[in-house]
């Protein structure tokens, strides 16, 4: 019916262009005498007709004959359908070409002919709605994977204390609170994607034991809540099923999720969290712990409080300016205090702390990555992705990039770029959303 409706408006244009446009025979006469006039219709027009249909109607049309089946299977049509979805096409394309094969990552050919987007569309439509829980060190964001953003947030440090401390009762209260605040959600009905808090990053045996202890405690709590499937996001490492009801697979470090949200598979993630700054090198989705820079511990309560803070591109030049601004926080603060608060990240001594600055920690990490010589081109670590609430300070990405270019030798600094948090404070949550909506996600998490 749709074909007949469109045909009337297309036929005259097709006749007028007959001499200049070569007709392409795509339908055999045996298909149907009522649509035999389409035999001489150019391919581009047929594709445009298909795009006017609903995806389900296009699939039904493909059952008519082999020629229509080949036409409906055209990637161009299904790329159009995917572009009409709420999710960004760039994110969909990145996920389906870079992440669909699981770990270790294997890039699908950039020429999309090897990937059937008709199959991708159908598989994505069948992916169940998951609950994503991003348990950061300061705040927790949670919501459904089909939504555009987290539905709720809770302040972990106020309500639950140090959530990474693997105490069963505390974790049980944490997850029960989340499910109680999400209306019409039962733990036993939907898969869960968990991004574990950034903690115990070192490559020491004690840190490894702490990570295992935390994961075991979380699994035990969710198991007792009858969760059907858990895709726990922490390390790039697979775990075997613990039972027929609770499966613990496709495990990623939360820094990897921030990298995926920026549509990258290799680079350095700088997470500026509630109290700890971590510099995490990642190669093809795997955390390179042996090259990871030690954590920088700073108290960022002031940065979290002063929402008008920013980072000056040139600190000395900004100091010399006589501009003033004010805000009400136990009195009046000058604009100088606004950017001086952010300057602590680069000059911790301003706050009386003995620690290396952010630019020094990132540069040292890059130097370790360069010396390791893991890849031929040596550029995998030159993309820096910022994550964490305090990383959203205006001017931070530009300042860090400038400092790195000034601090690093020319052999390394060429090509270095710093990407601000792609989704602000929700960057890690969106990285988990990218994975949970993958066409291959059910196979990964079952």
Label every model-predicted segment.
Residues 189, 283-355, 382-383:
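Phosphate-binding glycine-rich/basic clefts of nucleotide- and phosphate-handling proteins
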Residues 41-53, 64-72:
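Short hydrophobic alpha-helical "box" of cullin-RING ligase substrate receptors
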Residues 1-41, 48, 80-120:
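CRL adaptor-proximal regions
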Residues 77, 120-219, 288-291:
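Conserved phosphate-binding loops in N-terminal lobes of ATP-dependent enzymes
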Residues 174-182, 344-380, 399:
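Phosphate/ATP-binding catalytic cores across multiple sugar-kinase/actin-like superfamilies
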Residues 112-125, 223-270, 431-433:
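Conserved phosphate-binding catalytic cores of ATP/NTP-utilizing and phosphoryl-transfer enzymes
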Residues 228, 232-235, 254, 401-433:
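Conserved phosphate-binding/catalytic loops in two-lobed NTP-binding clefts
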Residues 239-243, 258-260, 299, 355, ...:
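Glycine-rich phosphate-binding/hydrolytic loop that grips phosphoryl groups
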């Amino acid at each position: 019916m749709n074909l007949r409706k469109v045909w009337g408006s297309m036929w005259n244009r097709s006749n007028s262009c007959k001499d200049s446009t070569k007709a392409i025979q795509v339908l055999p006469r045996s298909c149907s005498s009522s649509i035999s006039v389409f035999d001489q219709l150019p391919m581009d027009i047929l594709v445009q007709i298909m795009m006017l249909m609903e995806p389900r109607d296009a699939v039904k049309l493909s059952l008519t004959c082999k020629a229509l089946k080949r036409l409906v299977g055209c990637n161009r049509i299904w790329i159009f359908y995917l572009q009409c979805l709420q999710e960004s096409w760039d994110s969909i394309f990145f996920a389906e070409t870079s992440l669909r094969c699981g770990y270790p990552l294997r890039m699908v050919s950039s020429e999309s002919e090897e990937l059937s987007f008709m199959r991708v569309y159908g598989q994505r439509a069948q992916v169940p709605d998951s609950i994503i829980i991003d348990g950061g060190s300061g705040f927790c964001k949670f919501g459904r994977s089909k939504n555009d953003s987290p539905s709720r947030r809770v302040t972990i440090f106020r309500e639950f204390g140090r959530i990474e401390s693997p105490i069963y009762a505390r974790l049980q209260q944490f997850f029960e609170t989340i499910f109680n605040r999400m209306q019409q959600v039962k733990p036993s009905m939907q898969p869960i994607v968990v991004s574990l808090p950034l903690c115990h990053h070192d490559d020491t045996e004690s840190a490894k034991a702490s990570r295992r202890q935390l994961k075991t405690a979380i699994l035990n709590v969710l198991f007792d809540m009858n969760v059907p499937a858990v895709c726990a996001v922490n390390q790039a490492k697979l775990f075997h099923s613990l039972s027929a009801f609770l499966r613990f697979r496709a495990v990623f470090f939360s820094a990897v999720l921030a990298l995926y949200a920026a549509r990258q598979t290799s680079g350095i993630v700088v997470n500026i969290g509630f109290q700890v700054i971590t510099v995490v090198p990642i190669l093809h989705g795997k955390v390179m712990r042996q090259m990871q820079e030690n954590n920088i511990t700073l108290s960022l309560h002031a940065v979290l409080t002063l929402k008008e803070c920013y980072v000056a591109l040139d600190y000395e030049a900004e100091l010399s300016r006589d501009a003033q601004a004010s805000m009400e926080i136990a009195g009046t603060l000058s604009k100088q205090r606004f950017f001086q608060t952010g300057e602590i990240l680069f000059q911790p001594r301003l706050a009386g702390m003995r620690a290396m600055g952010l630019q020094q920690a990132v540069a040292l990490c890059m130097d370790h990555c360069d010396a390791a010589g893991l890849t031929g081109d040596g550029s995998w670590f030159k993309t820096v992705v910022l994550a964490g609430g305090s990383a959203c300070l205006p001017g931070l990405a530009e300042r860090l990039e400038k400092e790195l270019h000034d601090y690093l030798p020319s052999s390394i600094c060429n090509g270095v770029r710093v990407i601000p948090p792609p989704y602000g404070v929700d960057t890690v949550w969106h990285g988990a959303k990218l994975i949970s909506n993958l066409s291959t996600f059910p196979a990964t998490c079952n």
